[in-house]
């Protein structure tokens, strides 16, 4: 697996703040400040990758703002506008038992108890009550709540999720 395949997109640079190189970040994480846990970021745009080191970060009015080492003025900061933020997957904190990062579930094959392939997880969505697997396959799109009532096993090694779910649900 290459270095780029081991990285996960976590947000993007949406703008600049002030004149000293601070950047505004749109985080695609549950908590935007969780990006501050990762000192090394990879910025990707148009096939170009830049590795940067986080110098400082803060949340201001629910907005994540960061400063990178060596980015000390507004013009240099603005040149990073639109870059996607990627973090190496191996930098993620370990999960508890029966907890998963969404990025690890996307792409997994979902089968039911009859061993019928329902499709692959294309995405997940939050509903407030629980997360829902969005599965795409030859049976169309299937939505399955990601709760123990319907999800029997998640085998991250073989990338298979077994669900108590029929095609007629």
Curated annotation (Swiss-Prot):
Cell location: Cytoplasm
SUPFAM superfamilies linked: PRC-barrel domain, Translation proteins
Q: Name one GO molecular function term.
A: ribosome binding
Identify one Gene Ontology CC term for this UniProt entry: ribosome
Q: Which residues form the PRC barrel domain?
A: 97-169
Q: Does the keyword rRNA processing apply?
A: yes
Q: Does the keyword Cytoplasm apply?
A: yes
Q: Which residues form a coiled coil?
A: none
Q: Which UniProt keywords are present, listed alphabetically?
A: Chaperone, Cytoplasm, Ribosome biogenesis, rRNA processing
GO terms of biological process kind: ribosomal small subunit biogenesis; rRNA processing
Which Pfam families has this protein been placed in? PRC_RimM, RimM
Q: Can you state the subunit structure given in the record?
A: Binds ribosomal protein uS19.
Function comment:
An accessory protein needed during the final step in the assembly of 30S ribosomal subunit, possibly for assembly of the head region. Essential for efficient processing of 16S rRNA. May be needed both before and after RbfA during the maturation of 16S rRNA. It has affinity for free ribosomal 30S subunits but not for 70S ribosomes.
Q: What is known of its domains?
A: The PRC barrel domain binds ribosomal protein uS19.
Q: Which family does the record assign?
A: Belongs to the RimM family.
Name of protein: Ribosome maturation factor RimM
Query: Which species is this UniProt entry from?
Result: Neisseria meningitidis serogroup A / serotype 4A (strain DSM 15465 / Z2491)
The beginning of the lineage is: Bacteria, Pseudomonadati, Pseudomonadota, Betaproteobacteria, Neisseriales
């Amino acid at each position: 697996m290459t270095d780029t395949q081991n990285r996960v997109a976590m947000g993007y640079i949406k703008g600049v703040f002030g004149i000293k190189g601070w950047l505004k970040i749109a985080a695609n994480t549950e908590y935007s400040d969780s990006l501050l846990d990762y000192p090394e970021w990879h910025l990707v745009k148009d096939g170009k990758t830049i590795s940067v080191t986080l110098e400082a970060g803060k949340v201001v009015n629910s907005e994540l703002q960061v400063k990178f080492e060596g980015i000390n003025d507004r013009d240099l900061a603005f040149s990073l506008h639109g870059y996607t933020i990627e973090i190496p997957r191996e930098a993620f904190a370990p999960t508890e038992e029966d907890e998963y990062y969404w990025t690890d579930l996307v792409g997994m094959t979902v089968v039911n108890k009859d061993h019928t392939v329902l499709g692959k997880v294309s995405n997940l969505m939050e509903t407030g009550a629980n997360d829902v697997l969005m599965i795409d396959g030859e049976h169309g799109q299937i939505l399955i709540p990601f709760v123990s009532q319907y999800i029997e096993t998640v085998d991250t090694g073989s990338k298979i999720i077994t669900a108590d779910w029929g095609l007629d649900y």
